[in-house]
Amino acid sequence: MTYNQPNNKGFYGQFGGQFVPETLMTAVKQLEEAYVDSKKDPLFQAELKELLKDYVGRENPLYYAKRLTEYAGGAKIYLKREDLNHTGAHKINNALGQVLLAKKMGKNKVIAETGAGQHGVASATAAALFGMECTIYMGEEDVKRQSLNVFRMELLGAKVHSVTDGSRVLKDAVNAALRAWVAQVEDTHYVMGSVLGPHPFPQIVRDYQAVIGQEARAQFLEKENKLPDALVACVGGGSNSMGLFYPFVNDESVAMYGVEAAGLGIDTPHHAATITKGRPGVLHGTLMDVLQDENGQMLEAFSISAGLDYPGIGPEHSYFNAVGRAKYVDITDEEALEGFKILSRTEGIIPALESSHAIAYAVKLAKELGADKSMIVCLSGRGDKDVVQVKERLEAEKEVKK
């Protein structure tokens, strides 16, 4: 059966929808209309395609990781190299599309939330390219963890607003950005960074990120003359994974694995394994799986990776899980650090801590699948932003061992 989600109300099965105050409903409807028009507009599509090619550097390679495959001792591992994009991650695919859409709608300001800083950098980059004003909302904790990315955003002309509410991380940045959008909706577009938020955001972000899977599918067919047996990608909000998964959704022979952050372990309070440990609830304008206590209070998400510590997951992922189209697994901080080191040493590629979760799971899965199988792993970003954090962590561990 051909997949055709979301429905016209923005639901993926029971998940999704538009749970926003009346003050935002007009903006959300306007965005929906503009987006539908842009899909039919050949000039818009041509401009986006040209930017992805000449500015982002697409298409990026599908790389056979021979030494990583040998290390894992099983299935062939191919890496979709989103780390090679301009700005160093998959986030630019979506940011460019949305800022171009904002321009089409006649808006001259953009705002965005960011966790690890990658989406903030991508949004600031796209805003600079189009000469737009840009404000980025970032939790105070993440501002500390990712000071280099904060400087990058400011260098690109963006104002970085440090959010001191709540636990001062990604979910608080989203809250602040949504509040700011309500106040200036006439001339401002909110560049949602993941497959989250009220409809049409999850669909827009999915469609702009689907270039990952479209390229990977064609590249794999060309190299192997068949489809892969499995796809593996890390999941926070879930945009790089949805970008990889969506073009394969009707290929039933292809298994999909979304890798959540298990932090210090899913049996501790310190993790971000939303599908494994969460249940449906409304957060940031959409119904999805969220981490909550028995009274429905939001729980804090925790991960070594600033890009994965979000207490929800895109509604389409919740739907994939509910219908069994994708399987959601988890990797701890320790395992992710090991993945970070393994890829660096076997392939000379330093991955982002987010992507390291996918690498760590891919090594496990390769052993299970066996040598006659193959997989594509989304290498969603490069690790430059994480090198200092990993260095400090490993040095601290050495001290403890002494």
Curated annotation (Swiss-Prot):
Record's GO cellular component terms: cytoplasm
Keyword Cytoplasm appears in the UniProt entry: no
Pathway: Amino-acid biosynthesis; L-tryptophan biosynthesis; L-tryptophan from chorismate: step 5/5
Record keyword NAD present: no
Reactions it catalyzes: (1S,2R)-1-C-(indol-3-yl)glycerol 3-phosphate + L-serine = D-glyceraldehyde 3-phosphate + L-tryptophan + H2O
Cofactor annotation: pyridoxal 5'-phosphate
Enzyme Commission numbers on file: 4.2.1.20
Molecular function in Gene Ontology: tryptophan synthase activity
Record Pfam families: PALP
UniProt-listed InterPro entries: Trp_synth_b_CS, Trp_synth_beta, Trp_synth_beta/beta-like, TrpB-like_PALP, TrpB-like_PALP_sf
Modified residues (N6-(pyridoxal phosphate)lysine): 91
Superkingdom as given in the UniProt entry: Bacteria
Alphabetized UniProt keyword annotations: Amino-acid biosynthesis, Aromatic amino acid biosynthesis, Lyase, Pyridoxal phosphate, Tryptophan biosynthesis
Entry-linked SUPFAM superfamilies: Tryptophan synthase beta subunit-like PLP-dependent enzymes
Quaternary structure and interacting proteins, as annotated: Tetramer of two alpha and two beta chains.
Annotated family: Belongs to the TrpB family.
PANTHER family reported for this sequence: TRYPTOPHAN SYNTHASE, TRYPTOPHAN SYNTHASE-RELATED
Role, per record: The beta subunit is responsible for the synthesis of L-tryptophan from indole and L-serine.
Protein name: Tryptophan synthase beta chain
Provenance organism: Lactococcus lactis subsp. lactis (strain IL1403) (Streptococcus lactis)
Gene: trpB
